[in-house]
Amino acid sequence: MFAIIRTGGKQIKVEQGQEIFIEKIKGEVNDKIAFDEILMIDGKIGTPTIKGAKVLGTIIKQGKAKKIRVIRYHPKKNVNKIYGHRQPYTKVKIDEISAK
């Protein structure tokens, strides 16, 4: 059984037992979370979501992604600026997919 959920402005296909990386959400490690915006379950498409459907998961890890470097450069102006950014994420294990 699979489902497509919407979280963090993205649509993600999930299956039971799968571990996914999503945009950071509030919560501690081992907290249970429920995703209510379910767009599809096993081919059944919602309009726009499926009422009463839920995907339950457990937070495994809160972390930051690999650092990226952004360089601002103006030729002939002697202006060079380097910025760094690490995007926070939440790793979630999908425990249950339920359609009502």
Swiss-Prot record:
Which molecular-function annotations from GO does this UniProt entry contain? rRNA binding; structural constituent of ribosome
Which keywords, in A-to-Z order, does the entry hold?
Ribonucleoprotein, Ribosomal protein, RNA-binding, rRNA-binding
Report the GO terms under cellular component: cytoplasm; ribonucleoprotein complex; ribosome
- InterPro entries membership: bL21-like, bL21-like_sf, Ribosomal_bL21, Ribosomal_bL21_CS
Role description = This protein binds to 23S rRNA in the presence of protein L20.
Stated family: Belongs to the bacterial ribosomal protein bL21 family.
- Name by which UniProt lists this protein: Large ribosomal subunit protein bL21
Organism of provenance: Mycoplasma mycoides subsp. mycoides SC (strain CCUG 32753 / NCTC 10114 / PG1)
Task: Name the gene.
Answer: rplU
